[in-house]
């Protein structure tokens, strides 16, 4: 009885205490722009400044907190870049207090006096969205948002320039939540100036279909959403960047943008021949061979337009023109794991290329009422590409570097020895190590046109979530390609026992290949609420795909020596096959080769039926289901003198599960699983032997089975506001059953390969990562960030030698990566100590001598300083090292120093003169190594890494308000205000790699 009374008493006291809690609410607003201020700190203090409670304003500036009792209090509001605001409030009669809008003023005077009490937070988490504050990341003057993204915690930049955030590749860029240059992330990353960006949000965006239906179609994309600074999203802004560099380098950009309440228009222009290297200084340790694959010149014109009429009509449009010229030289050395003994190969190649492309995309979303949504997405692409290539390659049955320092030069002596018997045999030939030598050249050209369109209609049938969607997609494409290839091959171990020195053959061919394809589909979905926040979702989709390729091949391999020598004397040039064909002694049709010509026609009829269950709860979301995909394919194939007509009927199965749990508004757990079935290609299933290239023979396999891949991902994030501490971890796992691998039969006499696809089990990989970012002190002046990755790959493949029993080769690879940075920042200075580590442990079953236990690490400081008189300095020094390679030449040290110095001029510093220095010590290399189950490959490219560049940058703000003009005048940064935009102009004269290219 006493326990019951005590329990009731405690309950009554708790209820009384709760009843006495008074709620205080309000909205924090920027007085100059009337925009809400996000992430402001709101503190409730007693009259003697004793802390009681606190809160953080949300993205709408709203906050709420509780007062314990009636009385007089102080409400203190602080936010980075604003003056502290204190209000005296009185709580009476137990009533709540609604304060409405609370205006706060920008801290312009304090900034000029260089008085800052707290630094901007680097990252904040809101459910499954990462919000990065651009003011917390110092980038070099004039830089674009690519430089900003590289500095974000959890960001990874690959060798091809693609960017991953938290382990997922970024597929789309948004600006203020609106689509920007859809389908092209690099245009935004390399052209939007950092000076206009306020915050960056990283999250997974669902597809158009999933947004309106809730049905997960597996088309989720990772996006970066760049928010424009307050006051800069209205009016006209522009900037221009003109430059000149040593070694004929240039990198120019231009940008103009117009904003008002409904319209947003941006135009870009850029031209450079620096491989889009970006800006030196402040970047920290770099990678090996990153973005230095040859010499590349590019030009771009882009236009992006957004329109929004409240919630009724939204429109996004983009148009882009790209031109590129490439001049790429590569040297490759490979060890191929063919069996217990390796095969070695070396090659040198010279490639020239140029391309032009137009890409246009449009999106119209109309919401005529609260129950209806209509969306239309048309797009087109027009592209033309030219290429010239020349290469020399050789294969060896022993490590050639044990015999000679330059294997290709020595192998070329063997070819000359065939014509001049007075020359001695090459060292490789004397040792019996030279298997074959190939020299080849080619000219190719292609032009393509593609049209696509999507129309989607969604209707909500009730407020409970019942809805129906109808969608249709259609596409049409055509490609016309021409290519001329000339190959001379020498095989040195064939018939040696019979006294022959070598076997030699030529392959001269001209191909004309038109391709046509089109497709259409019709989709219907229905979502039924079973009970509160629980939905059953059904969908059906029919797709028809058609494609036809009709390649005509003309064979000149039976040329006489006189004809072959005549062709060898012609200098290749773009689309210059007429220079060769014009010398033919017979009409072109007489060289038509029906066996080498190829015709194929596909007709695919695909049905997709999906059933999903979806549960929405305050703490978690759960959806699971499966898709069944019956498919019928009709295939007609004419090749190698065979005519084949076949039909295949298969059924694919794809289960899916997505679970999200919310621990709090800043802490989430997500588990995702998707299984997919994939079928072997129709050509792989045909019992045909393609020996058109005697050194690369391909066979089909009618017995191939479909493969099934399991993909699993676990993701967790958390944020501790008090310590400005963010952490993220993820685990990815993928395993494929009956994956398709090429079984390679190696002929040690010719160096040729016969490949045939086979099913194999054992391919799987796992990757995990952990990101931790925290302020060390309460003001956020000191910060540390670490990003750790661990990956394991089990790669399998088939190998056999001279037709003997095939062997299963396994390469087990463990990779550990670490990127750590510790930094100090104040109003005018940021100093970072950066370090990276990559450890690679690999074990090869058939080739123990090819095992790897290597280290790549780099470390060094980066500094960014801004002076009161408008001068800015950015520099980084990085020592990059390799260790553990059996080839001692790979164990190198590279000390790379980059720097940039700029000075602002005129009132408000709209004019900036800047000088940049890349690789001041001339030590950066372009050598890289790759390892698979089949081979180890070392590649080195030509590049220009060390040069200097002078920039003159001017920025303009015509219509924007006072705050926008101030922000533009001072470069958009909250400190000594000197960062300009980044832009450009087209170069004067043709860039290297362009024009009428000849060898």
What do these predicted ranges mean?
Residues 45-50, 72-88:
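A short, solvent-exposed loop/turn motif at the edges and junctions
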Residues 280, 289-295, 328-336, 343-355, ...:
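Extracellular/periplasm-exposed beta-strand and loop segments of Gram-negative cell-envelope proteins
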Residues 320, 359-367, 371-383, 431-636, ...:
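Face-selective signature of the C-terminal outer-membrane beta-barrel domain
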Residues 22-30, 61, 100-102:
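A short, amphipathic beta-strand motif
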Residues 47-62:
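Short, acidic Ser/Thr/Gly-rich low-complexity loop/linker segments typical of extracellular
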Residues 32-46, 125:
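Short, ordered, surface-exposed loop/turn motifs in non-cytosolic proteins
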Residues 20, 60-62, 76, 82-83, ...:
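Membrane-proximal, glycine/serine-rich, low-complexity loop/turn segments characteristic
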Residues 37-38, 64-72:
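Short Pro-Gly-centered beta-turn/loop motif in secreted/extracellular proteins
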């Amino acid at each position: 009885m006493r326990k019951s009374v005590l329990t009731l008493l405690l309950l009554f006291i708790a209820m009384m205490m709760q009843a006495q809690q008074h709620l205080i609410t309000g909205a924090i607003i920027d007085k100059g722009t009337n925009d809400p201020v996000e992430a402001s700190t709101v503190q409730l203090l007693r009259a003697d400044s004793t802390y009681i409670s606190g809160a953080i304003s949300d993205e709408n500036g709203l906050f709420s907190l509780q007062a314990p009792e009636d009385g007089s209090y102080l409400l203190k509001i602080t936010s980075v870049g604003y003056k502290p605001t204190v209000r005296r409030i009185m709580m009476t009669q137990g009533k709540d207090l609604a304060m409405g809008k609370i205006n706060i003023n920008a801290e312009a005077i304090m900034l000029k006096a260089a008085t800052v009490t707290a630094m901007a937070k680097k990252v904040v988490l809101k459910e499954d969205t990462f919000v990065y504050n651009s003011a917390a990341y110092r980038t070099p003057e004039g830089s674009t948002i690519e430089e900003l993204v590289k500095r974000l915690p959890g960001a990874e930049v690959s060798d091809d320039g693609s960017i991953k955030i938290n382990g997922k590749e970024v597929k789309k860029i948004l600006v203020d939540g609106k689509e920007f240059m859809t389908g092209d992330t690099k245009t935004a990353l390399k052209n939007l100036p950092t000076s206009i960006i306020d915050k960056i949000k990283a999250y997974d965006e669902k597809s158009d279909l999933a947004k309106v239906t809730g049905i997960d179609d597996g088309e989720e994309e990772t996006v970066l959403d760049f928010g424009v600074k307050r006051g800069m999203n209205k009016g006209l802004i522009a900037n221009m960047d003109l430059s000149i560099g040593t070694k004929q380098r240039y990198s120019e950009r231009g940008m103009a943008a117009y904003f008002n309440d409904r319209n947003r228009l941006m135009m870009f222009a850029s031209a450079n021949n620096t491989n889009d290297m970006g800006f030196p200084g402040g970047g920290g340790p770099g990678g090996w061979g990153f973005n230095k694959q040859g010499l590349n010149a590019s030009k771009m014109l882009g236009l992006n337009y957004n329109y929004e009429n409240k919630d009724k009509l939204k429109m996004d449009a983009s148009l882009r023109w790209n031109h590129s010229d490439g001049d790429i030289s590569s040297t490759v050395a490979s060890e191929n794991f063919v069996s217990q003994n390796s095969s070695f190969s070396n090659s040198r190649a010279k490639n020239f290329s140029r391309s032009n492309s137009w890409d246009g995309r449009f999106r119209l979303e109309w919401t005529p009422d609260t129950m209806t949504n209509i969306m239309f997405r048309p797009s087109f692409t027009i592209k033309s590409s030219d290429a010239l290539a020349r290469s020399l390659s050789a294969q060896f049955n022993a490590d050639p570097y044990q015999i000679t320092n330059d294997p290709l030069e020595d192998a070329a002596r063997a070819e000359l020895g065939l014509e001049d018997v007075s020359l001695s045999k090459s060292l490789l030939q004397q040792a019996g190590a030279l298997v074959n030598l190939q020299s080849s050249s080619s000219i190719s050209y292609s032009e393509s046109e593609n049209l696509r369109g999507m129309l989607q209609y969604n209707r909500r049938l009730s407020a409970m979530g019942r809805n129906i969607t109808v969608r249709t997609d259609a596409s049409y494409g055509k490609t016309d390609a021409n290519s001329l290839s000339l190959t001379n091959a020498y095989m040195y171990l064939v018939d040696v026992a019979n006294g022959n020195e070598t076997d030699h053959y030529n392959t001269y061919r001209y191909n004309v290949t038109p391709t046509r394809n089109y497709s259409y589909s019709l989709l219907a979905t229905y979502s039924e609420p079973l009970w509160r926040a629980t939905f059953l979702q059904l969908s059906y989709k029919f797709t028809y795909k058609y494609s036809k390729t009709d390649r005509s091949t003309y064979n000149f391999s039976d040329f006489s020596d006189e004809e072959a020598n005549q062709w060898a004397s012609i200098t290749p040039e773009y689309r210059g096959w007429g220079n060769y064909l014009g010398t033919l002694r017979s009409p072109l049709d007489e060289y038509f080769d029906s066996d080498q010509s190829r015709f194929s026609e596909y007709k695919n009829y695909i049905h997709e039926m999906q059933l999903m269950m979806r549960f929405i709860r305050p703490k978690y979301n759960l959806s699971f289901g499966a898709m069944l995909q019956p498919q019928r394919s009709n295939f007609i194939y004419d090749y190698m003198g065979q005519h084949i007509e076949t039909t295949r009927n298969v059924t694919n199965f794809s289960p899916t599960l997505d679970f999200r749990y919310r621990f709090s508004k800043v802490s989430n757990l997500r588990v995702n699983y998707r299984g997919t079935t994939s079928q072997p290609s129709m050509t792989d299933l045909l019992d045909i032997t393609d020996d058109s290239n005697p050194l690369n023979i391909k066979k089909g396999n009618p017995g191939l089975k479909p493969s099934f891949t399991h993909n699993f991902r676990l993701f967790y994030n958390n944020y501790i506001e008090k310590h400005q501490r963010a952490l993220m971890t993820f685990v990815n796992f993928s395993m494929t059953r009956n994956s398709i691998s090429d079984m390679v039969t190696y002929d040690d006499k010719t160096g040729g390969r016969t490949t045939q696809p086979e099913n194999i089990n054992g391919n799987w990989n796992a990757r995990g990562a952990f990101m931790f970012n925290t302020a060390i002190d309460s003001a956020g002046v000191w910060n540390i960030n670490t990003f750790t990755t661990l990956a394991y790959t089990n790669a399998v493949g088939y190998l056999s030698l001279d037709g003997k029993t095939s062997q299963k080769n396994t390469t087990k690879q463990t990779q550990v990566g670490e990127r750590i940075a510790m930094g100090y920042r104040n109003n005018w200075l940021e100093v970072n100590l950066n370090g990276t580590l990559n450890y690679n442990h690999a074990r090869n079953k058939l080739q123990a001598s090819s095992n790897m236990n290597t280290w790549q690490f780099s470390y060094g400081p980066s500094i960014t300083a801004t002076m009161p008189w408008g001068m800015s300095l950015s520099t980084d020094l990085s020592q990059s090292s390799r260790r553990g390679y059996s080839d001692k030449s790979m164990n190198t040290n590279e000390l790379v120093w980059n720097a940039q110095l700029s000075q602002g001029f005129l009132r408000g510093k709209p004019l900036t003169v800047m000088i940049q220095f890349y690789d001041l010590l001339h030590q950066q290399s372009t050598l890289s190594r790759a390892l698979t189950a089949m081979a180890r490959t070392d590649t080195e490219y030509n590049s220009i890494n060390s040069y200097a560049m002078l920039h003159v940058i001017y920025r303009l703000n015509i219509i924007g308000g006072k705050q926008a003009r101030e922000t533009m005048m001072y470069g958009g940064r909250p400190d000594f205000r000197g960062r300009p935009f980044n832009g450009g102009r087209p170069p004067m004269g043709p860039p290297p790699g362009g024009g009428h290219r000849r060898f």
